[in-house]
Each structure stands twice: as structure tokens, then as C-alpha cells.
Amino acid sequence: MRALFSVSDKTGVVEFASQLVELGWEIIATGGTMKLLQDAGLKVINISEITGFPEICDGRVKTLHPKVHGGLLGRRDLESHIAQLKENGIEFIDMVCVNLYPFKQTIANPDVTMEDAIENIDIGGPSMLRSAAKNWSAVTVVCNPENYAKIISEIRETGNTTKETRLQLSAEAYTHTAEYDMMIATYMRKAAGLNEKLFLEYDLKQSLRYGENPHQSAKFYATLDTVPYSLATAEQLTGKELSYNNIQDANAALNIAREFDAPFCVGLKHMNPCGAAIGTDVVDAWKKAYEADKVSIFGGIVAVNREINKEVAELMKPIFLEIIMAPSFTDEALEVLRTKKNLRLLKVDMSKEQGGHNMYVSMNGGILVQEQDIETKTVTADMCVTEVKPCECQLTDLDFAWRIVKHVKSNAIVVVKDGATLGVGAGQMNRVGSAKIALEQAEAALKEVGKDIKAEGLVLGSDGFFPFDDTVTLAAEYGVKAIVQPGGSMRDADSVNKANECGITMLCTGMRHFKH
């Protein structure tokens, strides 16, 4: 049995080749791989001894030869193939261990030149992988060091890899070369100024019971790159499988949680926050978020950016929740929450750098692509456009409102007091309609605890500008004292004048946050 080695990623290759030699395999290798194995004391056949031809063109041509590809592609079950190979002095090759030049890593360098990129386009490697993968019934093709141990184990047990394993490895090899070619094609088309083509690469993570509704099928695919605050990398500690709607809502909750450094909690339903708050600690944040809307949070999803301890777990336990997400749970908290068998507990890494990614929306005949709305401006006093200026406590609430309203379906209005939402108006076709919903919710919440809304000096946030002054007029009727909005309307002056007339401070951020 003969194995051909030509690897860029040297991880575990010496041990793998050594074990094959112990099992009676001959090792053939190219250039740097051959030197590495020989330095480790292994007997290695130079590929040039097989081809009878030296490496040429600075190593660009090494394995592109009939004695390599004939040995890989020749069928062991066809006498005509066997005869042709024998006639031409070609021996079978039973395994190929190849991974490709690091093209992805090369072009990730912002200073990469075209020459650097070109020299890291592998030609012989993909050719060998494809030839070996085509003849998978007889040839083992290895492109991932993670498979080395499994291959050695099977050879020890049966003398060769199983047919099932070879088929799986063949599929992996074709996937590897397809991904490689997609990267090269994307780079070269951009360099040539050609029309962009979009290649998407995701792995199936989970087949879901159904989609948004029971009559819709659904699957969850995950990106190959690690994404911070990601459901794809979350560890589920308890509970039944996540549903399509669970994943949508949980992702929305995590995107809100990433906005805050202070202890924060959000309850969410149908991708809109129903209660959100910052607090002195996780218990305080939970209490404020829960009190914000005790009705809507029923059956909702909760995300917390601090460890869940026993105290907050006991407060959450009586409430029917679908999911609780946090960076960690104490053992005592897990003991409390595990008694609710259907409650899903997700441990999510929230410590990584907050990066953005592209968002895709499917439609008939195509998809829309946009960058994630990751940037949020910190609300500062110099954004004020009215005669009345904000105090420090108002600035804190204005910034909180601005970070929350960004994640509410447009038209979006939130009403805030002391670092907590009191009302959320989402998805209405006119802005004043959303404002009315949010203000009525806030009034009801305050009335429940014996407070008058007009005496509280509330803060209002809007994801879009005010086309008319009607939203400011309505806000003033409910006692709102500070407003944050993007600005940019042709009638901004009307809203500013109305705010001045009503003694309201208004800040314009210059950044809109529509969410459809």
C-alpha cells in the first residue's frame, strides 16, 4: 500500500506518516513535506523518483503527471485499467494526504500583492484531491488532519479504511476544493473588475422540527467562522431542541445584549424587546426588565450579559420562559432552573470582540445583502438641538433608549426611565401610532405602582426622524421631558420648535436605525 503526502498544514503529519510506516505502508512525498518526514527519520520516496521527472518552474509542476494521476484514477476492478497501468509502468497509489496552499490566509493580509496571491494558488494539490476523491472506492483521500486518528484506527482494525469512510472523505475533499476555488474566483473577479458573484458557505447545524409555522420545513445552517454573540457556537445546557422561532428570537436578544457593558437584561418576544434594563447587578437588571412588562415576557426569551446566580435563578423560575441565555450559570443556578424540563438554558460567549457580519434577506428571484447595523453612536450633550439642555441622568437614559430602539421593528418608539423600558411601540405604519402604544404602556406601568406619568420626566427614543411635530406633541401630553431621534427630516424645525415650546430637550444623533 502506498500513500502520497503533500501538505501545507503540517499538523500531526509526522505522527500520521510514522503510523502508516509501522503498518507497512510506503510513503511518497513532495518537496517540503518530504524533507520534514525524512528529518523525522522516515524512509520517504521522492515524487520525482515516481514520475521520472524533476520538479520544475519553482515547484509549480511536481505531481501533474500520468504516473501520479494514473495511480490514483486507475480502477482496480477493471482488467483493462490494470493492463494499461502495467504497460506504462504505473503503480497504484492507495492514499493521498494533501492540504492546499494557504490562499485564504494570504489574501487576508491587507498588504497582499497579486503576485503573493497567485503564488498561493495551489494547482497540483486540488488535482490530486479530485482524482483520489473520484476513485474513492479504492483510494483514501485525506485533506483534514482531524481525520488522521480515525484512519489509523480503521487500518489497524481491518487493514484499510472502510468504504463508508472513503466515501465521506471523498465528499470532504470535493467540499474543500470547491471552497478553495470559490475564494480564488472571488478574489480574481474583484481584481479583474468583473461583475461580483456571491458564494455562500454554511454548514448544516440542525434540522428543525418545522419553520415559523408547523407546515413549513426548516434547517439551521452555521457559518464556518466563529461569530461573537452567536447561537451557532452556544452551548445548550438543558431543555428541548431549539425551534426556528426560538433561534430567531434568541439571535435578536443577543444583538441587544451586545450593546451594553453594564449589567443588562432583556426579555424578548417576536424579535422585539418587551422589557429591558441595566442595573447595579444582574438581579437588579432582571427585576427592572421584568417589571417593565410582566405580561408580554410570558413565554419569552431572556438574555443576560452576566453570570446567572442562584438569586436571580429563583426569581426567574416561577415565570414561563422559553430560553435563558447568559455567559455562564453557577452550579446553584443550574440546580434551580433544571427542574423546569422544557426551559432551554444557553451558555453564550459574550466576551469576544464585537464584530459585524453581512445580513441576507431572501426574496423571489434573489437576495438582499447588507452589513449588520453594528454601529451605535453614544448619545452626548453636543447632539442637543433645543434650548433646553439635557442633564446627566437624562443623557444616561437617552443613550439607553437609543441603544434599545435600534433593535425594535420600525416604526419604533421606546419610553425609558432610570435605565429601564416602560413602553415599547413596534412595527406600526406611522410613527405617532408607535408612540401612542409606547406611552400608553408606560402610563399603565406607572399607574400600577401608584405613579403619575406626567410627574416622572420620561425619555423617548425613536429609530427614525419625525416627519411632523405630532409625535413631539403627543410625547408632551404624557410628560416626556427628553427625546432622542436621528433628525434629518425636511421639517426638523417644526419638531424642534414644538420641543422648545413644550420645554423638552431633544437630541439628534445623525444616524437612523430602521429595522424591517
Please annotate each region the language model reported.
Residues 1-50:
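N-terminal glycine-/serine-/threonine-rich phosphate-binding loop
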Residues 32-103:
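Glycine-rich nucleotide/cofactor/substrate-binding loop typically near the N-terminus or early
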Residues 146, 150-198, 319:
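Non-catalytic interaction/clamp surfaces of large macromolecular machines
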Residues 128, 135-148:
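Mobile "lid/hinge" segments at catalytic clefts and subdomain interfaces of large enzymes
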Residues 33-36, 51-57, 103-105, 127-130, ...:
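Short gly/pro/ser/thr-enriched loop/turn and capping motifs at secondary-structure boundaries
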Residues 1-5, 95-98, 180-516:
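ATP-dependent carboxylate/acyl-activation modules
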Residues 76-126, 130-132, 383, 387-392:
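Active-site/ligand-binding-proximal alpha/beta "capping" segment
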Residues 27, 44, 139-141, 345, ...:
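Hydrophobic beta-strand scaffold residues
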